[in-house]
Amino acid sequence: LDLEISANTETEVEACLNFSNSFADMYGPGPIYQFGQPTGFYGEQNCELPEDWSLLGILPHSHLMGTSWEVYAETPEGENLPIIKIPNWDFDWQGFYYPEYMQHIPAGSRIEAIATYDNTSDNDMTWGELTTDEMFFCPIYYIPYEEGDENIYLGIDTQTSISENITNI
């Protein structure tokens, strides 16, 4: 869990669940960073929320071999809450995506992040920060939920709104 703190005059904003136990895990072998894998490799990771969240934004991040992204939450009752689905990933789409309104995700929900890659025999993948390397990285920006958060309009223009640019589940 990698937390970054940002503040404004009214509230402190918690951020950045990057689906890794620590920053060091991003540089070592692990279930989602072993990129020299057979054809059809994909990254998948999940986490269970210890508290209710209000989702503010998400940053799915892959490089040139990324082919798709899907992130959703499954509530303890089994309800599927779509967060983002990008069936045809494009390198130029790296960036933050914001819901039109804060999205409430209940405590105990499991967030799943899944990305696929074109790692055919002609596309040998290694993890790294260069464009020609590859990544599976998906920070989620949130604040602890308060009643009524889901009614708060984030005021994001439609050029970066999840609901306007990305196909939901």
Locate predicted features.
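His-enriched metal-coordination microenvironments in redox/metal-binding proteins
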Residues: L1-E147
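Residue-level detector of functionally pivotal "anchor" positions at catalytic/ligand-binding pockets or at interdomain
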Residues: D149-I169
